[in-house]
């Protein structure tokens, strides 16, 4: 396995670990989620370019589109929660409080 693939897998693992450790604030969770999506995009692009699979060249672009949609929805939710409660704690998103 090339060293760049190992580095990208380690970046994904670090973002996943950050997602598990810093889950109290919504902004840090969104940043870790974006890091995970970026490392998945780079790894899938490298794998597809190394294997010369012509049928799956669209997969990284579709992953990037879904990542952009996820980021837009996450930022809209962050703005809504911070305007409503004044904080970006994830505990504010509990639906059982209603």
UniProtKB/Swiss-Prot annotation:
One Gene Ontology CC term in the entry: respiratory chain complex I
EC number(s) per entry: 7.1.1.2
Membrane-spanning ranges: 2-22, 28-48, 61-81
Molecular function per GO: NADH dehydrogenase (ubiquinone) activity
Pfam families documented for this protein: Oxidored_q2
GO BP annotations, alphabetical order: ATP synthesis coupled electron transport
Swiss-Prot/TrEMBL keywords: Electron transport, Membrane, Mitochondrion, Mitochondrion inner membrane, NAD, Respiratory chain, Translocase, Transmembrane, Transmembrane helix, Transport, Ubiquinone
Membrane topology classification: Multi-pass membrane protein
Annotated family: Belongs to the complex I subunit 4L family.
Function (record text): Core subunit of the mitochondrial membrane respiratory chain NADH dehydrogenase (Complex I) which catalyzes electron transfer from NADH through the respiratory chain, using ubiquinone as an electron acceptor. Part of the enzyme membrane arm which is embedded in the lipid bilayer and involved in proton translocation.
Subunit structure: Core subunit of respiratory chain NADH dehydrogenase (Complex I) which is composed of 45 different subunits.
Record's protein name: NADH-ubiquinone oxidoreductase chain 4L
This protein's encoding gene: MT-ND4L
